[in-house]
């Protein structure tokens, strides 16, 4: 791990520099992992872990937050076409309420890595987005704003975002009044107003501000919570 520290101090613009450097240090399978869904009032937190082929056009993969929906979907499809290895981890709103959103996010990434390992080889090194390492016995480094520093993390952020958006789109068909198809569970004005009018669903995070205030009210209304 000491050999990695110099790599982090002077990262070039190349967003596959870390992956190549780690491979040169003897880590043959490098995965990036990221999660989506820490801020919403409803729905799960979903993480992805991705191993990119060494010969792919890694510059295409950028932080999902700066890409359009159309571009994210295109890149998600591209990942399947270039035979990238992908793992998905999902932690429900119920578990989020039980263990808090930070621990749920780390758990989702752990599950994504385990899913990745079950579909292909176990990674030898992890590039993790954020400040905290994943609770799993693998060599790893946590990178703040990792999506801008690693193509593998960026690819994972795209997969997680598209996967979660599709989940919330399906949820919208059950509860159209909350606008999950456009807000993905985030606390938009329309979403907050719908909670006030209709109460909460079983998919809302009861420990979150903006939801917990309506738990008893929803029960009194006979709400879906």
Swiss-Prot record:
Cofactor(s) the record lists: Mn(2+); Mg(2+)
GO biological process: DNA replication, removal of RNA primer; mismatch repair
UniProt entry tagged with the keyword Hydrolase: yes
PROSITE patterns: RNASE_H_2
Assigned keywords, A-Z: Cytoplasm, Endonuclease, Hydrolase, Manganese, Metal-binding, Nuclease
Any Pfam family matching the protein: RNase_HII
Co-factor binding comment: Manganese or magnesium. Binds 1 divalent metal ion per monomer in the absence of substrate. May bind a second metal ion after substrate binding.
Subcellular localization(s) per the UniProt record: Cytoplasm
Classification via SUPFAM superfamilies: Ribonuclease H-like (SSF53098)
EC number: 3.1.26.4
Purpose of the protein: Endonuclease that specifically degrades the RNA of RNA-DNA hybrids.
PANTHER family: RIBONUCLEASE H2 SUBUNIT A, RIBONUCLEASE HII
Protein name in the entry: Ribonuclease HII
Gene behind this protein: rnhB
